Amino acid sequence: MEFKIEKKGTNKAIIEVEVEAEKFEEGLQKSYLKNAKYFKIPGFRPGKAPRSLIERAYGEEVFYDDAIDYVLNETYPKVIEESKLEVVSRPEVDIVQVGKGKSFIYKAEVYVKPEFELGQYKGVEITKIEYPVAEEEVEHELEHLREENARFVPVERPVENGDIVTIDFEGFVDGEPINGGSAKDYELTIGSNTFIPGFEEQLIGMNKGEEKEIEVTFPEDYQEPSLAGKKATFKVKVKDIKVKELPELDDEFAKDVSEFETLEELKANIRNRIREKNDKRAKDEMIDAILEKIAQNTSIDIPEPMIENQINYYVEDVARNLQYFGMTYERYLQAIGKTDKEFRSQFRERAEKAVRNNLILEKIAKVENIQATEEELQKELERLAKMYNLEVDKLKERLSEDDIEYIKEGIILNKAIDFIYENAKIISEDNQGENQEN
């Protein structure tokens, strides 16, 4: 087998492959053994007629299709491996020469990772981003902790706004029970707008043990079309009324919800966690700004299949999340009134940016000879094993060579990100002109 490569622009290649006649003959024989049973030849049982008789009766090309597929599947992966091309698309194949006793020649046109010259990536100048910790953030976290540790206390009085009521209910439209429109011991927070408009308001003033019929109208845009705009009657019984009591913010509260002895220690811990989160956000935004500046000085002709593959990744991620909530991707598209094409289009700009940044980082890693060390790989495997609650050795058993390479690539990209950040000129807004080196 021989092949030659012709580069087409910065992101395409045409590979011409010549395969020896014996290989194509091997494919013809395999095609014959696979398909002989489908041909009828007088005097022979299905599958027993000689190949030469079938070819004479149906034409020499009768076994070509499967033979061609066999030769392509046998030779194309080897060509890509030997050529060292970084192919990012399926090949468009054109058969140049085919026939018994002849060498088999084909051309494969493919998209490859684009060739490009890097713009300036060291000493990129950006403005420092900072997000100081606001006391409002600390107070918000404390309130969240109070909510999580709230007590629900029964009260002997009529229902008020904000109460948590336990109810039995059964809904009817035109005198017929609503499918899925009933429940027992259902907890509802009055004022949460969980139910149909008007339902919760009519519970206000009811007492424990009281029963009542509530009249409501389903919204015109209700998710179940058969109920949209319909008047409904709900038979409701209030079984319990509770109020939410939030704990006092004091040292006892801090002891109950954390390992700290005082409220001030808890606040300090919350403040530090917020600071870490804010610092990470600021760093991520500065890295994004550095990559944007590098991209402005770097021209890359990104192959369309790379963008489409990235969009596929985003859409598949959405579909997986929807599945978790019991909804299909198709039903979701119907609910939001978009076609697959329209939905995919909203990810295009994000996908282009992600692919572009990865290409830039890969190139920087190559130029700067950034590698993933065995120690770094082991550390990442330990992190993944902990995340999946596995022993490291068990995780390794499950990972293929491709999986390991993918993990290494992730380490290299992260090191390339660290490299451009550490080599940037970060200027404080308070001191324009004064470089804040990392």
Swiss-Prot record:
PROSITE patterns to which the protein is assigned, alphabetical: FKBP_PPIASE (PS50059)
Family annotation (InterPro entries): PPIase_dom_sf, PPIase_FKBP_dom, Trig_fac, Trigger_fac_C, Trigger_fac_C_sf, Trigger_fac_ribosome-bd_bac, Trigger_fac_ribosome-bd_sf, Trigger_fact/SurA_dom_sf
One MF annotation (Gene Ontology) recorded for this entry: peptidyl-prolyl cis-trans isomerase activity
Every PPIase FKBP-type domain range: 162-247
E.C. code: 5.2.1.8
Keyword list, A-Z: Cell cycle, Cell division, Chaperone, Cytoplasm, Isomerase, Rotamase
Family the UniProt entry places it in: Belongs to the FKBP-type PPIase family. Tig subfamily.
Note on domains (UniProt): Consists of 3 domains; the N-terminus binds the ribosome, the middle domain has PPIase activity, while the C-terminus has intrinsic chaperone activity on its own.
Protein name (database record): Trigger factor
